[in-house]
Amino acid sequence: CMSTMINWPARFAEMIDFVGLSEEDRQLIKASAPLILARAGSLNDFVYDALFKYPQSRQFFVTAHDEPDAKRIEDNKQTMLSWLRATVAAPLNDGYIRYLVGVSQMHRNIPIHRPGLPPVPPRFISGILSYYQTLITDLLHEHMSDSALALRTSKAWNKWLMVQVEPLLASYMSYQEDE
C-alpha cells in the first residue's frame, strides 16, 4: 500500500478558495472575537451538555462508574477554549493548519489515560462544528445592532468553520479498517 502525504497548507488554501473565504471575511471573524470570546464559557457549556446526552460521547467524560469526571471535563473544556481562541484569530499560517491536523490525531488515537476507550467518533467532531456555527450565528444576531453586518459575519464564520472540517477529520480519512 503506497501512502501519499497530504500537503495540508496547499489543501487548506484550496478549500479557502473553494468556499470563497475572503480577507474581508477573515476581518469580520477577527472583529467578532471579543463578542465570541466573552461568551466562550457558555458556548462550551452548551456543547458539553449536548455531548453528555449521547453514550458514545459521554464515555469520554465520565469515570469507570459512569459519574461525571470533573477534572477531565474541565481539561477538555480548556482545550476547546484554546481551539476557539486560535480560531477567532482566523490564522492562515502552517502552524495553525498543523494544529488542526494534530487535533484530529488526538481524537482518532486511543487515549493513553483511558486505554479501554475507542477513538472519538468523527460525527461528534463535525457535530460540534455545527453547534458552534449555530451558536455563533445566534450570538451575532443577538448582540450586533447592524443585522446586515451580523449576517455577513455569520456567513464568514460558516465558511471558516467548514474549511476546518477536513483537517479536523484528517486522521479519520486516512484510517483503514485493516490496519
Tell me the role of every PLM-derived stretch.
Residues 1, 51-54, 161:
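Short low-polarity hydrophobic stretches
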Residues 2, 9-30, 34:
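Serine/threonine-rich, low-complexity linker/repeat segments that form flexible spacers/stalks
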Residues 3-16, 142-179:
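Short terminal or interdomain "cap/linker" segment that borders an active site or interface and mediates
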Residues 12-15, 19, 37-139:
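Heme-based O2/NO sensor domains and their adjacent alpha-helical segments
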Residues 24, 31, 68, 120, ...:
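A structural signal for alpha-helical segments
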Residues 29, 73, 125, 129, ...:
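Hydrophobic packing residues in well-ordered alpha-helices of helical domains and bundles
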